[in-house]
Regions:
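Short beta-strand segments at enzyme active-site cores
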Residues: 1-9, 51-53, 85-87, 120-122
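Glycine-rich loop at the start of a catalytic domain that most often binds anionic cofactors/ligands
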Residues: 3-24
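Short, active-site-adjacent cap segments at secondary-structure transitions
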Residues: 5-9, 61-62, 91-93, 125-129, ...
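Conserved active-site and cofactor/substrate-binding residues in soluble primary-metabolism enzymes
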Residues: 8-10, 31, 35, 49, ...
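Short, flexible, mixed-charge acidic loops at enzyme active sites
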Residues: 11-18, 133-143
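Ligand-binding beta-strand-loop-alpha-helix segment within the catalytic cores
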Residues: 17-93
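Internal active-site segments that recognize and position negatively charged phosphoryl groups
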Residues: 80, 85-129
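Conserved small/polar residues in nucleotide/adenosyl-binding loops
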Residues: 146-148
Length: 148
């Protein structure tokens, strides 16, 4: 799961992300997506690894027909020895742009691909009921190895 199309688009266009309305964010995402994929291509090609791009929305993973199509695409890419770079399709997504959360989409992609493991990297220490940086009432969820 990737992220950063809007941020890279803002950088290229010298825009402040906080001042963008939804429709402008979607346009900026399409500019930044090319920048993002170029960075991935440059990095992976150093190791002679082939990549592809898959742009999804949460709806794509939750509607049965589209979910099956996505699953088949992943399977075929794996068979072709390509590494799919997945990003939220911010050019058509709405709620995800507002909340900036790819975790649910990453979880759905892990389910679709029958992944053995999903590792979410974060700058937050722990698992919370909601984003503790935005919500003061966020509560830490205590886990034990039994839960994991």
């Amino acid at each position: 799961m990737s992220s950063g199309a809007i941020a890279l688009g803002c950088k290229k266009m010298n825009y402040n992300k906080k001042n963008l309305k939804l429709d402008k964010s979607q346009a900026i995402a399409s500019i930044g997506q090319i920048e993002l994929m170029n960075l991935f291509l440059e990095t992976f090609s150093k190791y002679k690894l082939d990549i592809s791009q898959i742009l999804l929305t949460l709806d794509d993973t939750e509607e049965r027909r589209r979910s099956i199509n996505a699953k088949r695409t992943f399977e075929n890419l794996f068979d072709l020895d390509f590494i799919p770079i997945v990003n939220e399709n911010d050019t058509i997504a709405t709620s995800e742009i507002k909340y900036g959360d790819n975790d649910r989409l990453a979880s759905r992609v892990a389910q679709i691909t029958n992944a053995d493991t999903l590792i979410l990297l974060s700058d937050v220490d722990g698992l919370y009921t909601k984003n503790p940086k935005k919500f003061k009432d966020a509560q830490l969820i205590k886990l034990s190895l039994i839960h994991i």
